[in-house]
UniProtKB/Swiss-Prot annotation:
<dbReference type="GO" id="GO:0043022">
    <property type="term" value="F:ribosome binding"/>
</dbReference>
<dbReference type="GO" id="GO:0051301">
    <property type="term" value="P:cell division"/>
</dbReference>
<dbReference type="Pfam" id="PF00254">
    <property type="entry name" value="FKBP_C"/>
</dbReference>
<dbReference type="Pfam" id="PF05698">
    <property type="entry name" value="Trigger_C"/>
</dbReference>
<dbReference type="GO" id="GO:0015031">
    <property type="term" value="P:protein transport"/>
</dbReference>
<keyword id="KW-0143">Chaperone</keyword>
<keyword id="KW-0131">Cell cycle</keyword>
<keyword id="KW-0963">Cytoplasm</keyword>
<dbReference type="InterPro" id="IPR037041">
    <property type="entry name" value="Trigger_fac_C_sf"/>
</dbReference>
<dbReference type="GO" id="GO:0061077">
    <property type="term" value="P:chaperone-mediated protein folding"/>
</dbReference>
<keyword id="KW-0413">Isomerase</keyword>
<dbReference type="GO" id="GO:0043335">
    <property type="term" value="P:protein unfolding"/>
</dbReference>
<comment type="similarity">
    <text>Belongs to the FKBP-type PPIase family. Tig subfamily.</text>
</comment>
<dbReference type="GO" id="GO:0051083">
    <property type="term" value="P:'de novo' cotranslational protein folding"/>
</dbReference>
<dbReference type="InterPro" id="IPR001179">
    <property type="entry name" value="PPIase_FKBP_dom"/>
</dbReference>
<protein>
    <recommendedName>
        <fullName>Trigger factor</fullName>
        <ecNumber>5.2.1.8</ecNumber>
    </recommendedName>
</protein>
<dbReference type="InterPro" id="IPR005215">
    <property type="entry name" value="Trig_fac"/>
</dbReference>
Length: 433
């Protein structure tokens, strides 16, 4: 077999492949054995028609397509290896010759992985993230935990405040006409949650139990129901009941409830500070890594084939489908609820998909440029880490993966990211006013 690669414009080229006549004849033999099983010819049992009779009756051409199907995958795979190209999509194949006793020749128009022109990736200016945990952050976490232990208590007197939960009846109308979905009785709404139309919750504040009020709001221009988008609506609203959160004070008993390893408040705070400090340090490291990756990617120049973006979009749609499946939904149900279709969702995700592809290509190119290698020891360490993280044996992980190529690539990319951080110039983060 011979193969030649001719680069064309952009990321496309033509792969011309010639398979010797000897292999063609063998493929025709295989094709005949397959096809003859389905043929009925008077005077012969099914599947027992001699080859000469078959060709005389149907022509050898009847075997050509099956022969191509037999020859093409292997020949294309060998041609890719021989020419050392990296296809990123299925090729467009044009068979130029398939004939008994002659070479099989085909041309494949192939989109290949693009060239990456790296920019600066060392000495990148990165904001140094704060890792010290403040007393305010510690207290905020404590307050958040205590809020989960709060009981909802009916507010007998007083008005609605931010954070209260109100039980309301409402009936919405536009231009005096009620609209679908605009009415409810006994609806619980947490004020400040932002779950209603902008401006609605703010107007409920100050009302008391039994109060009635016309709440006037304007639907957002991008509202999912097009017939309501941008229109002013009036909601006749009645407050049935007001509840507030009765948050307990922190004591030794509650400290132990929040952290079974803590016997008193001081131990709880000490354990929490340690845990939050570790978490903040990890978040700071990840933020610095992300900034380094983004800057190195931004500095690179790549003409990304549309096929690579589409492949990444397919992967992202699949991942999204798996996430919403965990919430009891499927993609078709999501499309109905959101008013979107797959094409719109793909358009929405396209920029992220392109960024993902560019990032991956950039980091891989840096790994190649820096001759970064991954040892068996590196892979074993990563597998041990995965084993601890997911509580699965290393053997089971290997069995699930089939091979360690994915792990090897992940470790290689992580080494690139470490290289970016180690060679970065750190500056103090800009203080927010």
């Amino acid at each position: 077999m011979t193969a030649t690669w001719e680069k064309k414009e952009g990321n496309e080229g033509v792969l011309t492949v010639t398979v010797p006549a000897e292999k063609v004849n063998k493929a025709l033999d295989q094709a005949f054995k397959k096809v003859v099983k389905q043929i009925n010819v008077p005077g012969f049992r099914k599947g027992k028609v001699p080859r000469p009779i078959f060709e005389q009756r149907f022509g050898v051409e009847a075997l050509y397509q099956d022969a191509v199907d037999i020859l093409l995958p292997e020949a294309y795979g060998e041609a890719i290896e021989e020419t050392e190209i990296n296809p990123v999509a299925q090729p467009e194949v044009n068979v130029t010759q398939i004939e008994k006793g002659k070479d099989f020749i085909f041309e494949a128009t192939v989109t290949v992985e693009p060239e990456v022109k790296l920019g600066d990736y060392k000495g990148l200016e990165i904001e140094k993230q704060e890792t010290d945990l403040s007393d305010e952050e510690l207290q905020e976490s404590i307050d958040h935990s205590l809020s989960h232990l709060a009981e909802m208590v009916v507010k007998e007197d007083g008005a609605v405040e931010n954070g209260d939960t109100v039980n309301i009846d409402f009936s919405g109308s536009v231009d005096g006409e009620e609209f679908d979905g605009g009415q409810a009785e006994g609806y619980d709404l947490e004020i400040g949650s932002g779950s209603f139309i902008p401006g609605f919750e703010e107007q409920i504040e100050g009302m008391k139990t039994g109060d009635e009020k016309d709440v006037v709001v304007t639907f957002p221009e991008e509202y999912h129901a097009e017939e309501l988008a941008g229109k002013e609506a009036t909601f006749k609203t009645k407050v049935n009941e007001i509840k507030f959160k009765d948050v307990p004070e922190l004591n030794d008993e509650i400290a132990n409830e929040l952290d079974s390893d803590a016997e008193n408040v001081d131990e709880y705070k000490e354990n929490l500070r340690k845990r939050l400090s570790e978490q903040k340090a990890t978040e700071a490291e990840n933020t610095e890594k992300e900034e380094a990756i983004n800057k190195a990617t931004e500095n690179a120049s790549i003409d990304i084939p549309e096929a690579m973006i589409n492949t990444e979009l397919d992967r992202m749609i699949q991942e999204f489908g798996q996430r919403i499946q965990q919430q009891g939904l499927d993609l078709q149900t999501y499309y109905q609820i959101s008013g979107q279709n797959e094409e719109q969702l793909r358009d929405q995700m396209k920029d992220d998909a392109e960024q993902r592809v560019k990032t991956n290509l950039t980091l891989t190119a840096i790994a190649d440029e820096e001759n970064i290698e991954v040892s068996d020891e590196d892979i074993d360490k990563e597998l041990e880490k995965m084993s601890e993280q997911f509580n699965i044996s290393v053997e089971d992980i290997k069995s699930t993966l089939g091979n360690t190529d994915i792990v090897k690539n992940d470790v290689r990319i992580q080494k690139v990211i470490d290289l970016l951080r180690d060679n970065a110039k750190y500056v103090e983060a800009t203080k927010e006013d």
